[in-house]
Amino acid sequence: MHIYKTTAENGTASYEIQKSRFIAYTSHVETEAEARDFVTAIKKKHFDARHNCSAWVLGEDSSQQKSNDDGEPGGTAGNPILEAIKQHGLTNVVVVVTRYFGGIKLGAGGLIRAYSHTASLGLEATPCLE
């Protein structure tokens, strides 16, 4: 039997930088369909947000990975969220980071840092189990 670390329940955290508000949502999922359903639910909840970027890691060996920038410049949102999941050593988890644009452009580096930091905050606020 392979032991892996995952989230025990849903979590959330928020972060604000230069008037943009970022909100992370995390959830334990077992399948890609569950991950997609969670992303869809967050998009419906925050239909008025500029972006709802996401990433997930599935499987005991973390072999299934997916990220989505949802209109942000390529590689500035979904991939940093995915990296945060991997840095926390988690699998069977999905993270969605919602962004409400505050009118000030953050640049590629600023977006990467903001999405990564917000995802990490969300994961740190979520109880985990092995």
Q: What are the functions of these language-model segments?
A:
Residues M1-G75:
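C-terminal regulatory domains involved in ligand/effector binding and gene-expression control
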Residues A13-Y15, W56, H88, R99-I104, ...:
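Flexible, active-site-adjacent loop/turn segments at secondary-structure boundaries
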Residues A33-T40, E83, R113, H117, ...:
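Solvent-exposed alpha-helical segments within well-ordered globular domains of core cellular machineries
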Residues Q65, G75-I104:
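Ordered, amphipathic secondary-structure segments that act as subunit-interaction surfaces
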Residues P73, A77, I81, A108-L111, ...:
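Helical mechanochemical/support elements of P-loop NTPase systems and associated helical scaffolds
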Residues V94-V97, I104-E130:
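Glycine- and Gly-Pro-enriched alpha-helical subdomains that act as flexible
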